[in-house]
């Protein structure tokens, strides 16, 4: 069903005037072009209803309100319907998602969405994407005013938007056309060869989206939610499996923690190494080491008889500066024993003066003995 613009827009609504393209043409061009192109007979709205065209309540409301008094949309041809610009509120998107899960899940949710399907994009966004593209470039999106698909394509003078209806047997048609197809892909390929009436324009190439999934439609999440809603037993079994998995995981964690604690408790601890015992001299100060007490037991034995002074050098340290001695031999080659002049020496050093005095006496006596006759 086609609506032609009699006035720019409804009073107070400035959304339609800011479109990138003018998507409507004069009413008198419609029938002429269609007759020249021999597009064939097109079923009217009454015929479409008899064939079971599925239109949502929002679509029916749009068609009825278009002919209401005082509206900007004037019913020019009851055989075609272009999309009425809408706000695309959240409630409409929710209804559209529910409709997709109910009727389109077999090809849209369970498979990869075609690249020409852009999801929830606005009319302005579609026109912005199609403006730099060549003639006949097209895309499919969700409608902003009805729960259905919209075919948007680039024409020579503007960007056109046509509603796509679905018959009772599941086939898709351009609303107002008589060519029905089981798949949207087949419908689009058909109009790459057969022109769309009444403008006589054909589709050339699809406009691929730049995202992995259609805008506003997560295929995996929606398919999962749809399958759960349709099969409550499956959903319950999944919940039970998740609960069992969580319980088993918790039990395994508790068992592992208990095993770890038991192994740590049964494992013998290594002995603590004892500190090395150092002699007490290590902890004494250097000052105390210099003044150590002499040993109680001497390291030498006292002689039974006194040792002569000249024998003090034997066995005594040679580095003592005050230990000066001289060995003197007697006439018979042996040292005199028990000389009356010598004093007893108890292993104590004598002074230099005593040594000189003794040496002088010995030398004078020896000279006297040599000089006297024997």
UniProtKB/Swiss-Prot annotation:
Gene3D superfamilies: SH2 domain. Expression limited to tissues of the immune system and, in particular, activated T-cells and natural killer cells. Expressed in the thymus, lymph node, and to a lesser extent, in the spleen and bone marrow. According to PubMed:10553045, also expressed in the lung. It comes from Mus musculus (Mouse). The gene is Sh2d2a. Its main location: cytoplasm. Residues 221-232 have a biased composition (Basic and acidic residues). Residues 256-266 have a biased composition (Polar residues). Residues 116-207 form the SH2 domain. Residues 268-279 have a biased composition (Pro residues). Pfam families: SH2. The keyword Cell membrane applies. Induction: Up-regulated substantially after T-cell activation. The modification Phosphoserine is found at residues 237, 316. Could be a T-cell-specific adapter protein involved in the control of T-cell activation. May play a role in p56-LCK-mediated T-cell signaling. Could be involved in the regulation of responses to T-cell activation stimuli, specifically proliferation and lymphokine production. Interactions with ITK and TXK may provide important biochemical links of these two important kinases with other components in the T-cell activation machinery. This is SH2 domain-containing protein 2A. Phosphorylated on tyrosine residues upon TCR-stimulation. It comes from the Eukaryota. Interacts with KDR. Interacts with p56-LCK, TXK and ITK. Residues 213-232, 241-301, 321-340, 353-374 are annotated as: Disordered. The lineage of its organism: Eukaryota, Metazoa, Chordata, Craniata, Vertebrata. One of its GO terms (molecular function) is SH3 domain binding.
